[in-house]
Amino acid sequence: MAFSPNVLLGGRVCAAVARSGFATRRVTIPGSTSREPDPDFDWEPEERELQEVESALKRQKKAIRFQKIRRQMEASGAPPRTLTWEAMEQIRYLHREFSESWSVPRLAEGFDVSTDVIRRVLKSKFIPTLEQKLKQDQKVLKKIGLARSIPELPGPGDSSKPLSAGQSVSGSLLIPGDEASSRGHGHSTALKAIELNTQSTNITTRQTERNKGVQGLEEGKDFVPVAAGHPTSTCRGARGIDSDGLPSDKRLEELKAGEAGDQIFSKRVVQRGREFFDSNGNFLYRI
């Protein structure tokens, strides 16, 4: 019986020590920074949610501070426009239809602008009028040094007057975002049409030059001496050529027999077009 009270007393002491150790884990002394929280301690769900909210607030404060510093460093007002309305429509279309492959960084790299410009374009819902589009595009093209022949806008009194044929606006400025997929096909079709027109022009020029050359050759043929253009019967008889321009039978016999009269002909005959000459350059006959 005397042993049992000691056992009970020892059990109570152990329980008190255990309770005091558990309490030291949860209760911290004010002003004491030496004790660190136990990483193995299982926090309550409410405490975890509180920590998540605190971390989110810290991140939000950092972002707000960064935006303030950035606005102070940058120039006031909207940044200068560097994209045409056609390019902005293409950016919106690519991001809307192919958002996975065309992310904001890739769009910024493809259009050679910063990611902030891409975000401003995607965030903007402003729909300008045709006059505003033309004015802004003209400014952008002048700034980048690629000013094209954009038609001048009519005055305030001529707003209801349609543009003439020479002042028709380029179709690339009027295509909406839903039709941006057909721009590449239309551009290639236009290039093919230009190539076909160039080829047809070249072919026409070649045919004209060829006709001029043939006409010049015909004029050269007609421009011959009278004796050669209209040979007399005496010349025909001497050369053995009949009225058709072909050698006579007698002349052929003389050529075959080698009796060429006073002229010495070679057995080798050279053909030049429709005329035949010997190796010495003497005219034989014409076909």
From Swiss-Prot:
The organism's place on the tree of life at top rank: Eukaryota
Glycosylation sites: N202
Keywords from the named record: Developmental protein, Differentiation, Glycoprotein, Membrane, Mitochondrion, Nucleus, Secreted, Signal
Keyword tRNA processing among UniProt keywords: no
Signal peptide span: 1-23
Recorded GO CC terms: extracellular region; mitochondrial membrane; nucleus
Region (Disordered): 149-169
Biological process per Gene Ontology, one example term: positive regulation of mitochondrial translation
Subcellular location field: Nucleus; Secreted; Mitochondrion membrane
Chief location category: nucleus
MF terms (GO), sorted A to Z: rRNA binding
Function: Plays an essential role in mitochondrial ribosome biogenesis. As a component of a functional protein-RNA module, consisting of RCC1L, NGRN, RPUSD3, RPUSD4, TRUB2, FASTKD2 and 16S mitochondrial ribosomal RNA (16S mt-rRNA), controls 16S mt-rRNA abundance and is required for intra-mitochondrial translation of core subunits of the oxidative phosphorylation system.
Quaternary context: Forms a regulatory protein-RNA complex, consisting of RCC1L, NGRN, RPUSD3, RPUSD4, TRUB2, FASTKD2 and 16S mt-rRNA. Interacts with 16S mt-rRNA; this interaction is direct.
Family under the similarity heading: Belongs to the neugrin family.
Protein name: Neugrin
Organism: Bos taurus (Bovine)
